[in-house]
Amino acid sequence: MKVHNSRSVRRFKVTTDGKNLVSHAGTSLLGELADRAGLTQAMSEAMADCGISWNTHDPGVVLTHLAVAIADGADCLTDFEALREQSELFGDVASVSTAWRAVKATASLELRCIRKAVAAAREIVWAAAPPGGITIDIDATLLNAFSEKQDARATYKHGYGFHPIGAWCDTTSEPLAAILRPGNAGSNDTDDHLELLDQAIAALPSEYQVGHEPGDDASLVRHHIVVRADSAGASHGFVCGLTEANIEYSIGHQINSKVREALLLFQEEDWEQAIEADGTVREGAWVGELTPFMDLSSWGQGARLVIRRERPHPGAQLSMFDMSEGYRHTCFITNAVKLDDDVPALELRHRGHARVEDRVRNWKDCGLQNLPFASFTQNLAWVAASLIAGSLLAWAQMTCLDGELKKAEPKTLRYRILHVAAVLVRRGRQLILRLDETWPWASALKRAFLRLRTTFP
């Protein structure tokens, strides 16, 4: 009779006499990246005039450590202790109480300076790993408040908390900007969208901003920018702001009565087959342009409306119009210059906006799932740190990691890279981080450190 092992782990004796062991060794990659990309120094300068006398710790360094801790999985200040107990890797890390003072000292002026500091570091990173075309995705999400917090309000989904809106660079997966709003903030608030757009453009390296100030001549543009949003961004004021900044847009549009009337004039032979990312035909989906059948003058010069129909999947919730037609319809407006047979490509590009849901989920996994403070101002500082955490993870993937880790989500990076244990050995005047040779991703982490030090000497 074959005997099977009925234990989930081996039996072992536990002692506390280990020496030179460090956990979360891979997280030091993010700290070193912040140093080499100039973020730590820029953060120090941003917090220089915060109004508090610091005898031991630099508040900018404290906030950088906080961002690294959030990237490592921290979701409250007490998790900061994980870095403090790894001084051989992270240096002199502040206590939780000192970190609290740094957060409390971060007012609106400091937040503006922090955004400039991150933009300066991004310029260095992008110079080392230039992205392709720039596509910015905008989306809002809901955060529940599980305790009393300033400016928490009832949400449209009958919850209670906040309704932040954020912008991400789809090309690099970086969070560019975010606005923390009360839970009752409107989804299609034009002023919020315009403010977020200004912050997102300001977060780009300086050469990418050229020609994108409101009123700039289009001939000044050096880098083409596309902004995508769902129908919450379909306001005339926001579209006007995008047009004035010479930015191409692709924004969801409601299927209203005017769209339905235009669709009734659309001929069957005018539909084109939708395509997949590899150029193959997407079965059961068709696209068309309704611009000739609608008055889009209120959306500005060059506005176009593209519609898509697809066979609904089982269980899909359809409108009365969709049920009568037998298809599910979606549409969006864009100011893309019209080219021959470009409708399927434009629809494919707009469909890529769905990736923003992954960005939002990863943002919540970087400290945003539950805002830790009662004060709204202090939660603004936490949101700023969470954006830096997301940027550090994205920069590491852009410049240091390869293979499947280059596209991995934060949870995967933590389990495989950031939380790995190691042994610190001193040899002469050199400090050596020894990784377990049996760990499947040890070589990937070693290559990441080598790439980091080669890219940012």
Task: For each feature predicted by the language model, list its residue ranges.
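Short amphipathic alpha-helical "interface-anchor" segments enriched in bulky aromatics
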Residues: 33, 80, 343-376, 381-396
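Dynamic "connector" segments at or just before major functional cores
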Residues: 1-160, 164-186, 190-219, 397, ...
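Basic, amphipathic alpha-helical segments enriched in Lys/Arg and hydrophobic/aromatic residues
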Residues: 370-439, 445
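Structural motif
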Residues: 20-21, 52-61, 322-323, 373-383, ...
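An anionic, glycine-rich sequence signature occurring as long contiguous blocks
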Residues: 2-12, 16-19, 250-364, 447-457
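An internal, acidic/charged active-site-proximal segment
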Residues: 180-314
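Short, glycine-/Ser/Thr-/acidic-enriched flexible segments
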Residues: 141-143, 182-183, 256, 311-313, ...
